[in-house]
Structures are given as structure tokens and as C-alpha cells.
């Protein structure tokens, strides 16, 4: 049986976002499930936009998610190989030189659209005579090169979409070599997939038409194409998610919001599938349940609050030994198991535990809260004597009700605000024993 080899091929032209991290996760999980290999390739042929800082950030995000690669390379290191294939395809007459300027191509595109026609290249340069080509060269025009798509049916069996069919006539001959000599994604990707024995490729459905063209590229190079799976796009309300939209970067989720690695991995590897989205605690367990056939063809809606809820579920499911190691990473190793168990049921992110430590150990500022001072002083006088325990809250509130007649929100909200300066959070019954008795009285009487 052929060894499964998958790849993830980001362009280092921006930060990883939730759309392409999903592709990275699924390719890694597919390889892991089938005891295969996972290759990280950087598509850095866009010399103007590719930056080392983005490459470093992509690697950092992948390592954070425990997506480890067996091999990595960048396309700029393989230019001589691409050049050799360019010459081969020129000999086979599957590449041809074109001399239109970007402005001329844009005018053609606008004209076609104005006539209600698809913007397909008209092949004006396909049959240029030597004399015509010489004229363009004398005008100091540098050629770009297009791949000649045969006008014949194209089909393949997609792991997610099933049978996919295209008519070659409906596809535009793509530019594969720019006028400055740099290569575009289309042909380089095929050459890499052949040379690195890629067997399976999982990517977004915005690549489906690219795949149709690349099928002919594989054929032109006498190679059987990999098996493809095209994921439905992730959308946020009415807009598909991409690096150009912004606001959905993995770096933002982990650094600014504080989402756990396994929450991100669990959520985006199950989003859009028929499987229940659960907070898995390891990539191995996630790989064991992974089934590419479970993914839907329909667009997938991403709502950040769903990810935050999953993050909460993951946090409260962790044992303290695991949490202890994570607390060191956020410089909160001073937090003990009792404190964690008391506040964790209401944490959204791990870093929230530091906020609650400060709330319990530093008098909060309540000056702007307009609290009922007389009621709070009365409540302070009714605080049960002796050690404060989890039972103290129910004893205390019963006594307050008996004396003041207050119940429900009218009773507990002023107490919560005076003690924590927050309208919500862990149950006060759990928080109360974490605050010194003298501090409780101080907060109630000085509010």
C-alpha cells in the first residue's frame, strides 16, 4: 500500500487565519490517522509580498497547535527544478509566451464582462508568428507564460465533494510564469507534489477550479495526480474568511484572547463535519476519531462565541496536574488547587484565573458602582462568625433575608459588586472562602 503523504502549503504573505489552519489540521490528522507523513511547504514565489516574519509566525502557530512536520522546504529553493519543467512543457507546447501588458489584459477582462462573457483569456498570443513576437521584444516587452488547457472534459473523485466535472473550455489558460521571471503558485505546486510524492491534498473549495487545471498539468507531466478533498469555505455571517479580511488570525486567538491550543485544534478540525464538536485533550485522540468522509459540502459558519464555549469546556475538564504546568506558562504558579477548583467553572480562558486571584487578594475599585452603602453595612454585621466556608454564603443570605426581606438579585447583586466589582463570575459561595474575613468586612463597609 502506498504511504500516505500530505502537505500544507501556506504563502508567507500574512498571518495564519482560521480558514487555512483548518486545512493544516486536516492534512496533519489525515496523515497521522494513516501512519503517514506531513510536509510543510512555503509557497514563497511572490517575491514582493513574501516575508520572513510571516514564515516565522506560521511556524510558531503550527508548533503551538502541536502540528509537527516531517519535512519542510520553500519554493524559492527549487527554482532550477521549475525552470527545467518550464523547458519541458515548452517543448511539449503546453506553455506559450504572451506579451500583453497588465493594462491590456484588464481592458480585455472588462470588455468580456461588459458583454456578459466569462473573463477567459482569448489566446491571442497562442499563435503569434516569429515576426510578431520579435516586434513585442523590440518594444522591450517581457513575456509571461501561460499553461495551455486542453478543451476536453476534466473529472476526478473528490474525498468530500464526490464526483467533480469541468469542461476545459470553461477554464482560462493560467499564467504560470510572470513577466519578471518569477513563478506563480499553479505549476510550482504540481511539480512539488510530484517530486515529494504527495498522495492526498485537503484544501478549500476556492481551489476547485485550480485543481481542474492542475489535473491537466499532472497529465502533461505523465504523473497520476494526488487524491483531492475540497472543504466548504468557513464564513462569518456574509463574508468568507481569509487573511485579507483580517481579525481571525490564530495569533490573535492564542495571544490576545487566550484560547487553548487543543480548543482551537478540536474546534476547527471538527467544524463542518457530522461529528460532535468536543474538547479533545490531545492530537492523538483527535486523529483517532478523524474521518474525512464526515465533512459537509455546505458552507460552514464560524461564530467566535462557539470557540470560546469550547475553550471553557476544555478548561473545566482538565485535571490540576495538567493545569499546574499551564499556570507556569502564564506566570501564575502561585495558584493552588483549591483556588483553581473554586473559580474554574466560570473561566473563559486560563488567564482569567489571574484576574480572579487579584480580585480575591486586592481590594477592587467600586467607586463608580453607586452601591447601597447602608444595606452593605447591615450585611457586614450579619456575616457569620468564625471561619468562612462554602456553607457561609447560604447561612449569611438566609439571615439577610430574615432581617431585610431582600431576595434574589436585590439581595446578592450588591454583595457581588461590593466584593468583586463584577456583575458575573464564579459563585459567591465559592469565592467567599478565598477572601480573608477582615477583607470581606472592609469591602462591605468601605464601599
Swiss-Prot record:
GO-annotated biological processes: glutamyl-tRNA aminoacylation
Gene3D superfamilies the record matches: 1.10.10.350, HUPs
Enzyme Commission identifier(s): 6.1.1.17
Keyword list, A-Z: Aminoacyl-tRNA synthetase, ATP-binding, Cytoplasm, Ligase, Nucleotide-binding, Protein biosynthesis
Database matches in SUPFAM superfamilies: An anticodon-binding domain of class I aminoacyl-tRNA synthetases, Nucleotidylyl transferase
Predominant localisation class: cytoplasm
Source superkingdom: Bacteria
Reaction catalysis annotation: tRNA(Glu) + L-glutamate + ATP = L-glutamyl-tRNA(Glu) + AMP + diphosphate
Cellular compartments annotated: Cytoplasm
Chain residues that bind ATP: 243
UniProt keyword Aminoacyl-tRNA synthetase, yes or no: yes
Motif ('HIGH' region): 10-20
Segments carrying motif 'KMSKS' region: 240-244
GO cellular component: cytoplasm
The keyword Ligase is annotated on this UniProt entry: yes
Single GO term (MF): tRNA binding
Record family assignment: Belongs to the class-I aminoacyl-tRNA synthetase family. Glutamate--tRNA ligase type 1 subfamily.
PANTHER family xref list: GLUTAMATE--TRNA LIGASE, GLUTAMATE--TRNA LIGASE, MITOCHONDRIAL-RELATED
Known function: Catalyzes the attachment of glutamate to tRNA(Glu) in a two-step reaction: glutamate is first activated by ATP to form Glu-AMP and then transferred to the acceptor end of tRNA(Glu).
Subunit and partners: Monomer.
Full protein name: Glutamate--tRNA ligase 1
Organism encoding this protein: Rickettsia conorii (strain ATCC VR-613 / Malish 7)
Gene designation: gltX1
Amino acid at each position: 500500500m502506498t504511504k500516505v503523504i500530505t502537505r500544507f502549503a501556506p504563502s508567507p504573505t500574512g498571518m495564519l487565519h482560521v480558514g487555512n489552519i483548518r486545512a493544516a489540521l486536516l492534512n496533519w490528522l489525515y496523515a497521522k490517522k494513516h501512519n503517514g507523513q506531513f510536509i510543510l511547504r512555503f509557497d514563497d514565489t511572490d517575491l514582493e509580498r513574501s516575508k520572513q516574519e510571516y514564515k516565522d509566525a506560521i511556524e510558531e502557530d503550527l508548533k503551538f497547535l502541536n502540528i509537527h512536520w516531517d519535512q519542510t522546504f520553500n519554493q524559492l529553493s527549487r527554482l532550477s527544478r521549475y525552470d527545467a519543467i518550464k523547458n519541458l512543457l515548452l517543448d511539449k507546447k503546453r506553455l506559450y509566451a504572451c506579451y500583453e501588458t497588465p493594462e491590456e489584459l484588464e481592458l480585455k477582462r472588462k470588455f468580456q464582462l461588459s458583454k456578459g462573457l466569462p473573463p477567459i483569456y482569448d489566446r491571442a498570443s497562442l499563435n503569434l508568428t516569429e515576426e510578431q513576437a520579435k516586434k513585442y521584444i523590440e518594444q522591450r516587452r517581457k513575456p509571461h507564460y501561460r499553461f495551455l488547457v486542453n478543451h476536453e472534459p476534466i473529472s476526478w473523485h473528490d474525498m468530500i465533494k464526490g464526483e467533480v466535472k469541468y469542461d476545459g473550455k470553461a477554464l482560462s489558460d493560467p499564467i504560470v510564469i510572470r513577466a519578471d521571471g518569477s513563478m506563480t503558485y499553479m505549476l510550482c505546486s504540481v511539480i512539488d507534489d510530484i517530486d515529494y510524492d504527495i498522495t492526498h491534498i485537503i484544501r478549500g473549495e476556492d481551489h476547485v477550479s485550480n485543481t481542474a487545471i492542475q489535473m491537466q498539468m499532472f497529465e502533461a507531466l505523465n504523473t497520476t495526480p494526488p487524491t483531492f478533498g475540497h472543504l466548504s469555505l468557513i464564513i462569518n455571517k456574509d463574508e468568507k474568511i481569509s487573511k485579507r479580511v483580517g481579525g481571525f488570525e490564530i495569533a490573535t486567538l492564542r495571544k490576545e484572547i487566550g484560547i487553548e491550543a487543543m480548543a482551537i485544534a478540536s474546534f476547527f478540525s471538527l467544524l463542518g463535519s457530522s461529528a460532535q464538536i468536543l474538547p479533545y485533550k490531545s492530537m492523538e485522540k483527535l486523529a483517532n476519531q478523524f474521518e474525512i468522509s464526515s465533512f459537509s459540502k455546505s458552507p460552514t459558519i464560524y461564530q467566535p462565541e462557539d470557540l470560546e464555549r469550547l475553550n471553557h469546556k476544555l478548561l473545566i475538564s482538565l485535571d490540576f496536574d495538567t493545569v499546574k504546568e499551564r499556570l507556569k506558562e502564564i506566570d501564575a504558579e502561585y495558584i493552588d488547587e483549591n483556588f483553581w477548583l473554586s473559580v474554574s467553572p466560570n473561566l473563559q480562558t486560563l488567564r482569567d484565573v489571574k484576574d480572579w486571584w487579584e480580585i480575591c487578594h486586592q481590594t477592587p475599585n467600586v467607586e463608580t458602582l453607586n452601591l447601597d452603602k447602608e444595606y452593605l453595612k447591615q450585611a457586614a454585621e450579619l456575616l457569620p462568625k468564625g471561619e468562612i466556608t462554602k456553607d457561609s454564603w447560604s447561612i449569611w443570605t438566609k439571615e439577610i433575608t430574615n432581617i431585610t426581606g431582600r431576595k434574589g438579585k436585590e439581595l446578592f447583586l450588591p454583595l457581588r459588586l461590593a466584593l468583586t466589582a463584577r456583575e458575573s463570575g464564579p459563585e459567591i459561595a465559592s469565592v467567599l472562602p478565598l477572601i480573608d474575613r477582615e477583607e470581606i468586612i472592609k469591602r462591605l463597609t468601605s464601599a
